[in-house]
Amino acid sequence: MRWTLMLQLLQLLLQLLMAQSQSLERISQDRIPLFRLTQQGDWDSLDRHPTDSLCVGLPAAGVTTLNLANRSLESLPSCLPRTLRSLDGSHNLLRALSEPVLGRLPELRVLTLHHNRISVLHWGRDTLAELRELDLSHNLLTELPPCAGPSGSSLRSLALAGNPLRALLPRTFACFPALRLLNLSCSELGHIAQEAFAGVDGGPLAALELLDLSGTSLERVESGWIRNLPKLKSLFLRKMPRLKTLEGDIFKMTPNLRQLDCGDSPALTSVHTEIFQDTPNLQVLQFQNCNLSSFGPWNSSQVLSVSLFGNPLICSCELAWLLVDVNKTVLHRAADTMCEPALGSTGPFSGPLSLSHLSNVCRSDQSTTLLPSNPGRFDHSVFAPRIQGPSIEQSTALSAQPGGSQQNITKVPSLTMTSPTQGSWMYKDASEETAQSTNSELVYSPSRALPGAASSGAEQTATHILEPNISSASTPLVSKYLEPLPTSPNPRSLPQTKQRTQATPRALHTDPPQDEIPVLLLDDDSEEEETRDQVAAPPQDVSCEYHPCKHLQTPCAELQRRFRCRCPGLSGEDTTPDPPTLQGVSEVTDTSVLVHWCAPNSVVLWYQIHYVAEGRSGNQSVVDIYATARQHPLYKLTPGTTYHVCVLAANRAGLSQSQTSGWRRSCATFTTKPSSVVIFWGLCTASGLLLVSTLVLSVCLWRQRWKPHRQFYDTHLVAFKNPARAEEVTQWE
C-alpha cells in the first residue's frame, strides 16, 4: 500500500514536468522568427507559418498576382491558384525549382525567384510553355539543365545574374527559341562554348536582342559563339576585369548591333575600330574608364554617340574625327575627356588637353590634315545635339540652304540606356523608323554652330525638346528596360545663340543628293505628339517620396526617372560613401537581434554589419546586404553578452568610416537576454526541489498517520510485607 502511493505520486510529478517542458519548448519555437514581411492584401493573416499553412484561406481561383517575398520559404506551397499569372518568391530559402511546381501553374507568365538558394533546376521541354519572364538572379546555380528536345517555350526574358556559373555548354539555351533578353552578369562565367547559343537543330538563337555579360571573367569576345546571335542589338560588357581587346570579325554576323557598352573595364587596352564596319546600325559606344590610348575612325552611316572619358588617351589629331562632324558623331562629356602627349613628342601638344580643344590645336598646326568635314554645306544650321541631364536628346534642326528655301529636317535619335547592376537590368530599343509628313512644325535643339555656319546678319536661337524614340515594332518587354547614360557632375554648357530663319513652307523632299544629310521628317501622328508633350513637360520641382529609413525602399534615382521629382544630393559612385545612421536594435533575444539603420546621401551598392562581443578580440561581420535593405538580423549571439555593432555602407570606392557619436552615428551597443536554456534548467531544478520536498513531507505525514498507537495493559501491584517488620503482604487489583 505504501509503495503504491509513492509510485502514483512519482508518475503525477513526471507528467507535470513533461507538460512544463513542452510549454517552454513551444515558447522557444515561437521566438525563432524575429520578423516577417507580410503580403499586403487579402492574405495578411496567412503568414502564420512559412509554407503550406499559407493555404489556409487562400482562394482557389481568380487570383492572378501573388507576392511571397521574404517569407523564409523552403519550398513553394502546393496549393497555389492555377490562375496565377505573376508570382514573386524572391528573398526566400528555396533550394530547387522542379517541374511539378511549374506544372501546377499553367497560366504563369512572370516568375521572380531572385535571392534564394536554388542550386538545382528540373523541368521538361513543355514546362515553361507559357512563361514569359523568369528571374533566377543571385542563386546558387552552377550549371543549367540540358535541353531534352524541341520546345514550345515562349520565354522572352531570363535573368541569371549573380550565379556561380563557370561555363556555358553547347545549346544551353536551345529550349528557349523566343528568348530576347538574357542577363548573365556578375557570374563566374569564364568560358562560352561555340555552340552555346545554338538552337536544337544547330541554327542560331534568332530572337535574342540583349545580352549582358558584365562582371564576368571572359577574356575575349569570340566569333564562334556570337555568330549565333544575328539579331543582337545590345551587348553589355561592363566591369570586365579580364577583357583585354576587341578584334577580329566578331561582329560580322551581328549587323543589327546598336549599343556596345564596355565601360569600367580596366584591362581593355585595345579596340580595333575596323570591327565596327560590320555594324551599320551602331548608335552607342561606351568605353569610359577603360585603358584605351587611341580610338581610330571608321565609316558610319548612323548618328553615333561615343563615351571615352577616363581613358589614358594619347593626344593625336586622329582623335579629331570625334568632333569634326557633329552631325554624325557626338562625343559624350568631351570637356572631361583628356589626352596626354606621347613621351618624347615634339608636336603641337605640350601638356594634357581636353578633346573639346583638340580641333583648334590641330587646325593651327599646318602640318596636320584633318578628316574632311565639308562644313560649308550646313550654313545657318543649329544642329549639334546637346548632352543635358541624363539623356542624349532627340532633336530636329532646320538647315536653310544658301540661295534657296528648301528645308532639311534631320532627326537625331535619342539614345537612353544604362549598364545593368544588382537588380537593375535596363534597356531601350532605339527606333529606326520615321514617317513622312507635310507638317511644317520645326523643333530646334541647343547646339554649337558648325565652323563657318554663323552669318553676320543672323541671330541664332537654341531650344530643346525630349522626344521618345520607341519603334512601333518594339514590344513592351523590350522598351521597359530604360535608364539614362552616366552624366558628369558638372556637365559642360554649350554655347547658346539665337537664330531667326524665314522659310516659305514647301513640299519637303525626302530624297536629297548622296552627299547631303538624309532628310528624316517628324511623324504627324497624334499619339507621338501626345507622348512627346508628356516627355517634354518640364520637371516638377517636388521632392521624391523617398524615405532613407524605409526597408526595401525604391532607390531615389528610379523614383526620379519614374515621377520626374527631385532627389536629395548624392555623392558619386567614385566617392567613399558617408556612414549610415544606425537607428537602433529591436527584437532582442538571447541569441539574436534585429538591427535598423538609415541610408546616407551617397551611392550605396551594398551594406555591411560588423559586431564584436565586449571583452573579446574577434570581429564578426555580415557582408553583401542588398542596397535597398534598412534592417538585418544577427544570429548565433552569446546570451547575456554586451555587443558593439556598426553598420557600414560600401560602393566601388570603398567602405564608409565607423562613427560612434553625433547625429550620424553608425554604431551602437546592446545586450542580449539571458539564455532560455539556463532559465529552463533553473525552473526544472526548482521543480525538482519542490517535488523532493513534497515527497518527503508526504512520507512523513503518511508515517505519522499510520503509526500504531501504544497499548496499555492491566498492571497488578503486589506488596510484600517487610520481613523485618513482619508486615502482611497486600495485593491490589
From Swiss-Prot:
GO terms for cellular component: plasma membrane. InterPro entries: FN3_dom, FN3_sf, Ig-like_fold, Leu-rich_rpt, Leu-rich_rpt_typical-subtyp, LRR_dom_sf. Its main location: membrane. It comes from Mus musculus. Residues 698-733 are cytoplasmic. It is a single-pass type I membrane protein. Residues 395-423, 480-518 are annotated as: Disordered. LRR repeats lie at residues 62-82, 83-106, 107-128, 130-151, 154-175, 178-199, 207-230, 231-253, 256-278, 281-302. The chain crosses the membrane at residues 677-697. May play an important role in hippocampus-dependent long-lasting memory. This is Leucine-rich repeat neuronal protein 4. Keywords: Glycoprotein, Leucine-rich repeat, Membrane, Repeat, Signal, Transmembrane, Transmembrane helix. Residues 20-676 are extracellular. Residues 1-19 form the signal peptide. The gene is Lrrn4. It holds the Pfam family LRR_8. Residues 490-504 have a biased composition (Polar residues). Residues 311-364 form the LRRCT domain. Glycans are attached at residues 70, 183, 291, 299, 327, 408, 469, 619. Disruption phenotype: Mice are viable and fertile, but show impaired memory retention. Lrrn4-deficient mice are able to maintain memories for one day in hippocampus-dependent learning tasks, but are unable to retain memories for four days after learning. In contrast, in hippocampus-independent tasks Lrrn4-deficient mice normally retain memories for at least seven days.
